[in-house]
UniProtKB/Swiss-Prot annotation:
Keywords: Calcium channel impairing toxin, Cleavage on pair of basic residues, Disulfide bond, Ion channel impairing toxin, Knottin, Neurotoxin, Presynaptic neurotoxin, Secreted, Signal, Toxin, Voltage-gated calcium channel impairing toxin. Expressed by the venom duct. It comes from the Eukaryota. It comes from Conus imperialis (Imperial cone). Residues 23-51 form a propeptide. This is Omega-conotoxin-like 3. Residues 1-22 form the signal peptide. The keyword Disulfide bond applies. PROSITE patterns: OMEGA_CONOTOXIN. Belongs to the conotoxin O1 superfamily. Disulfide bonds join C53-C71, C60-C75, C70-C79. The lineage of its organism: Eukaryota, Metazoa, Spiralia, Lophotrochozoa, Mollusca.
Length: 81
């Protein structure tokens, strides 16, 4: 009997907590894509997305990976413009 009462109270508590938090999260989920786009415009938010690139006339090697390292995207032993 005590276990049944405890289970009923626990279910009521969890149901009430779902209804309390659901009202607050409704607006947050709708605005989530807008917030992410807004954060990407901030330089501090996108520090991890920035990559260093090699300037022109800098040695980059002779592979396809070297072209990815150059700021211009052209690599023939050195970065080209």
């Amino acid at each position: 009997m005590k276990l049944t009462c405890m289970m009923i109270v626990a279910v009521l508590f969890l149901t009430a907590s779902i209804f309390i938090t659901a009202d607050n999260s409704r607006n947050g989920i709708e605005n989530l894509p807008r917030m992410r786009r807004h954060e990407m415009k901030k330089p501090k938010a996108s520090k991890l997305n920035k990559r260093g690139c090699l300037p022109d006339e800098y040695f980059c090697g002779f592979s396809m990976i070297g072209a990815l390292l150059c700021c211009s995207g052209w690599c023939l032993g050195i970065c080209m413009t």
